[in-house]
């Protein structure tokens, strides 16, 4: 919120330099060959020298320098996310909020050293007329802006696949429920920076955009993901469900941490090629009709309402229930770290733990077996997705604005 990027000494935490941008920076900067690249809410991309924070170049990605009031600050009509995607020597950024607003979302591929435009594109609309072309029910052909992701030679913005030259790639809509084959990549249906944990939104590492379908029973799906070359690690918060919505009850089973092979894909029961689903989560009951009859979540009755949604045909590699509200997660070579407030429920102060007033817990887990290796406490919880690892050290950004460094066993 202070529009500021800080460089700290990794060993002692001393501030080495700081740089103030023209708008807030909503996600971590990108380091590339001695440069610090980041976007900001004033519609610009900035490049600094990593050694001393000196400005190398600045690029206006917004089509005009026009400002509006947004989220208690003055921002560009076309903001730029903080994290910049660098692929094959090109820095990719977007400027804009939605393909349906203000002329759409501008796309740029820039030369990191100079800011020179290498590629450019535009995602705009589509704007349908009432008497014109109609879209498949539950499929939204437009998109909101998000941090860019690179996978398999493509650039992705949520459900929008792009070529490295920033040309949009057509996707196949698979059913009237709005599922689409968008290509394998990590995405969030509400945006990778959304930490609100609305119960019908999901992070997924999948080929499919879920559309109308719920994904609370799917593999490689949860409220936060980490993936390496072979395995995806996920946090599942809403593992119960009534008819329409996934549910969670604080202070009961805890939060589910689990692992899947990257080759395990979600499936819809009954579609061509699907296999019998694995029942792996606590199943919920719900009232059907107006009577007292109760049927299980796996019932065919779901076919007439919200349906089961995506399921799995192969079991998870491992599952671990933890009494920790996991808000941050990072994997090193041989340890998976998760951190967050304890899963406590006090009837007198029901939101105390969730709001961070009960401290936090950091847990180390074996990525191979799912066994807990160790744990420690933190005075303050991390911000959402606010933990990284560097050689021999673990860094966390906390909700009180501080940064902590936890040394590894070999560090002093």
Each model region followed by its residue ranges:
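Noncatalytic, solvent-exposed loop/strand surfaces
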Residues: 1-412
């Amino acid at each position: 919120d202070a529009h500021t990027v800080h460089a700290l000494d990794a060993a002692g935490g001393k501030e080495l330099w700081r740089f103030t941008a023209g708008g807030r920076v909503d996600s971590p900067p990108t380091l590339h060959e001695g440069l610090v690249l980041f976007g900001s809410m004033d519609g610009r991309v900035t490049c600094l020298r990593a050694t001393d924070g000196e400005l190398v170049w600045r690029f206006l990605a917004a089509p005009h320098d026009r400002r509006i009031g947004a989220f208690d600050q003055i921002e560009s009509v076309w903001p730029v996310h903080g994290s910049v995607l660098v692929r094959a020597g090109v820095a990719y950024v977007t400027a804009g909020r939605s393909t349906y607003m203000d002329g759409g979302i501008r796309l740029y591929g820039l030369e990191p050293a100079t800011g020179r435009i290498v590629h450019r594109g535009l995602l705009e609309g589509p704007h349908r007329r009432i008497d014109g072309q109609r879209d498949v029910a539950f499929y939204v052909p437009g998109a909101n802006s998000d941090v860019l992701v690179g996978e398999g030679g493509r650039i992705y913005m949520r459900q929008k696949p792009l070529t490295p030259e920033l040309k949009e790639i057509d996707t196949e809509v698979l059913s009237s429920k709005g599922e689409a084959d968008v290509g394998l990549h990590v995405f969030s249906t509400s945006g990778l920076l959304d930490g609100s944990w609305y119960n019908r939104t999901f992070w997924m590492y999948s080929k499919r955009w879920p559309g109308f379908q719920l994904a609370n029973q799917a593999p490689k799906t949860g409220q936060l993901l980490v993936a390496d070359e072979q395995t995806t690690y996920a946090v599942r918060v809403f593992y119960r469900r009534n008819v329409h919505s996934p549910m969670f009850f604080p202070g009961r089973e805890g939060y589910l941490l689990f692992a899947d092979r990257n080759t395990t894909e979600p499936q819809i029961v009954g579609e061509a090629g699907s296999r019998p689903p694995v029942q792996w989560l606590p199943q919920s009951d719900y009232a059907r009709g107006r009577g007292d009859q109760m049927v299980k979540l796996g019932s065919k009755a779901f076919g007439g309402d919200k349906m089961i949604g995506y399921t799995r045909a192969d079991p998870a590699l491992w599952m671990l229930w933890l009494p920790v509200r996991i808000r941050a997660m990072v994997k090193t070579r041989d340890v998976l770290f998760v951190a967050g407030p304890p899963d406590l429920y006090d009837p007198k102060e029901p939101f105390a733990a969730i709001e961070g007033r009960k401290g936090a817990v950091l847990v180390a887990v074996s990525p191979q077996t799912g066994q807990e290796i160790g744990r420690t406490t933190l005075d303050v919880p991390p911000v959402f997705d606010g933990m990284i690892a560097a050689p021999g050290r673990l860094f966390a950004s906390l909700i009180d604005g501080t940064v902590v460094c936890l040394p590894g066993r070999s560090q002093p």
